[in-house]
């Protein structure tokens, strides 16, 4: 028997919004430690990795390991039926071919449940190697989303350059060239507004704008985003999900700067 309950459906809605544009379907691997999802995006360019810890749920029970293949579009339709403040519970029997998603209003006067068919998905687990990154940047998630959106108007690619002076985002195309520089912040009143750069050595890498913009769909989950970079290694874009886990996106750099 598997059962997981969250106090607010809005969290699950935001998680799904963060991945459904990249993935049509995915397997949720459930164990007593929580829920994991790992999948290549539809075009096999980026990797999505989601971790939700069991202790972050209001209630969590998983008697035996369970893999639930789900159509994320179908799941999004079901979640649209929930109010943001509703409790949401996911339940499945061992070896079941369906999952039940139940919404309960805060005053418990309304309970709705939806049954969704599970899918058999052949998904290989890719080993993600531990990497000592040359540069790790923590910055406001809204700021990163805005930079990615703005630079996408100039080019299909964005160059991220990290030095001890700061981090620079650049794009160049027919319209012209755009450069946005962020220096490390001094003291800030609010931690979520800080820009923090940990650099071992400078790094300059080029990435596809459309994937970065897809990753920023996770912005509502977190006030800060962490970018981890190293030459010839995929960029890691990480959003923490408060008290519950994190979502990470991996994107390989473009080999040549002039490649579109």
UniProtKB/Swiss-Prot annotation:
Pull one GO CC term from this UniProt entry: chromatin
The GO biological-process annotations, alphabetized, read as: DNA damage response; DNA replication; DNA-templated DNA replication; eggshell chorion gene amplification; leading strand elongation; mismatch repair; mitotic spindle organization; nucleotide-excision repair
**Which Pfam families does this one have?**
PCNA_C, PCNA_N
Molecular function as annotated in GO:
chromatin binding; DNA binding; DNA polymerase processivity factor activity
Q: Which PROSITE patterns match?
A: PCNA_1, PCNA_2
Q: What happens when the gene is disrupted?
A: Mutant flies show temperature-sensitive lethality, hypersensitivity to DNA-damaging agents such as ionizing radiation and methyl methanesulfonate, suppression of position-effect variegation and female sterility.
Q: In which tissues is it expressed?
A: Expressed at high levels in adult ovary.
Q: Which residues bind DNA?
A: 61-80
SUPFAM superfamilies given in the database record: DNA clamp (SSF55979)
Q: Which InterPro entries match?
A: DNA_clamp_sf, Pr_cel_nuc_antig, Pr_cel_nuc_antig_C, Pr_cel_nuc_antig_CS, Pr_cel_nuc_antig_N
- Alphabetical keyword list: Chromosome, Cytoplasm, DNA replication, DNA-binding, Nucleus
Superkingdom classification of source = Eukaryota
Q: Where in the cell is it found?
A: Nucleus; Chromosome; Cytoplasm
Subunit composition and interactions:
Homotrimer. Forms a complex with activator 1 heteropentamer in the presence of ATP. Interacts with E2f. Interacts with the catalytic subunits of two DNA polymerase complexes: PolD1 from the delta complex and PolE1/DNApol-epsilon255 from the epsilon complex.
Q: Please describe what this protein does.
A: Likely to be an auxiliary protein of DNA polymerase delta complex and is probably involved in the control of DNA replication and repair by increasing the polymerase's processibility.
Q: Which family does it belong to?
A: Belongs to the PCNA family.
What PANTHER family is this protein classified in?
PROLIFERATING CELL NUCLEAR ANTIGEN (PTHR11352:SF0)
This protein's name: Proliferating cell nuclear antigen
Q: Which organism is it from?
A: Drosophila melanogaster
């Amino acid at each position: 028997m598997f059962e997981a309950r969250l106090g607010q459906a809005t969290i699950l809605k935001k998680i799904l919004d963060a991945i459904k544009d990249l993935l049509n379907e995915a397997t949720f691997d459930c164990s007593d430690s929580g829920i994991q999802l790992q999948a290549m995006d539809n075009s096999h360019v980026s990797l999505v990795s989601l971790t939700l810890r069991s202790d972050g749920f209001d209630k969590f029970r998983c008697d035996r390991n369970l893999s639930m293949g789900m159509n994320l579009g179908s799941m999004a339709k079901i979640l649209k039926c929930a109010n943001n403040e509703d409790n949401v519970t996911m339940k499945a029997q061992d070896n079941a071919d369906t999952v039940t998603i139940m919404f309960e209003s805060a005053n418990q006067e309304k309970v709705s449940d939806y049954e969704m068919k599970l899918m058999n998905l052949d998904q290989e687990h890719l080993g993600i190697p531990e990497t000592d990154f040359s540069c790790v940047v923590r910055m406001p998630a809204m700021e990163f989303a805005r930079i990615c959106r703005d630079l996408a108007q100039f080019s299909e690619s964005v160059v991220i350059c990290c030095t001890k002076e700061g981090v620079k985002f650049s794009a160049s195309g027919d319209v012209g060239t755009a450069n946005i520089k962020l220096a490390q912040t001094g003291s800030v009143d609010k931690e979520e507004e800080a820009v923090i750069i940990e650099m071992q050595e400078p790094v300059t890498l080029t990435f596809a704008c459309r994937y970065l913009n897809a990753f920023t769909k996770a912005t509502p989950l977190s006030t800060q985003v962490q970018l981890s970079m190293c030459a010839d290694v995929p960029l890691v874009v990480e959003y923490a999900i408060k008290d519950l886990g994190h979502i990470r996106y991996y994107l390989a750099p473009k080999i040549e700067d002039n490649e579109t």
